[in-house]
Regions:
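Conserved active-site and SAM-binding loop architecture
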Residues: 1-167
């Protein structure tokens, strides 16, 4: 893994720093989870400000640079937002939902793929009759210092499917 933040779990396989300082290597696959703060539709109320001060454009250019790096197989993961309409990436190759991978929740997430087959669902859950507080848990999280981190966590079932199908 690579992030500007330290890993939540002790590991010797975590590079803390700028991904572009580390990306030039002998990689055959990269699964990128770029920050969605300035891109996701959940922050649409703040888009005007983010466009005006350049944050949104910088975020788009960061993602485009990741996608165009010299790695043969790439996945860019990001929730529904402006990448599909304002970036050179266009629409995602596919959208995935946590309930397709063993979780009783919804969070429509785009995958922009290069050199990879679309991810196949592994364990589709029926959400019929479940309350929104369960299926849309992330929307109901109370304010907290870690709310952003909880909302951005990759679902284990999706990560496992990526590892098994692409790894």
């Amino acid at each position: 893994s690579c992030d500007l933040l330290p890993s939540d779990k002790p590991t010797f396989r975590h590079y803390m720093g700028d991904v572009f300082d580390f990306i030039d290597g002998d990689w055959d696959l990269a699964i990128f989870h770029p920050p969605c703060t300035d891109l996701a539709i959940s922050g649409a109320a703040h888009f005007k400000e983010k466009i005006k001060d350049g944050r949104q454009q910088r975020a788009i250019e960061f993602v485009e640079r990741l996608y165009n790096c010299d790695i043969p197989r790439i996945c860019i993961e990001n929730p529904v937002g402006v990448l599909s309409t304002k970036s050179k990436l266009g629409k995602p190759t596919q959208y995935v939902q946590p309930y397709e991978y063993g979780h009783y929740e919804t969070k429509k997430t785009g995958l922009w793929l290069r050199g990879l087959d679309p991810l196949k669902p592994t364990d589709i859950k029926d959400l019929t009759g479940l309350p929104k507080k369960v299926t849309q848990r992330l929307h109901y999280l109370p304010p907290s210092p870690d709310r952003w981190k909880i909302r951005s966590t990759t679902y284990k079932g999706i990560a496992q499917a990526m590892a098994e199908q692409w790894g």
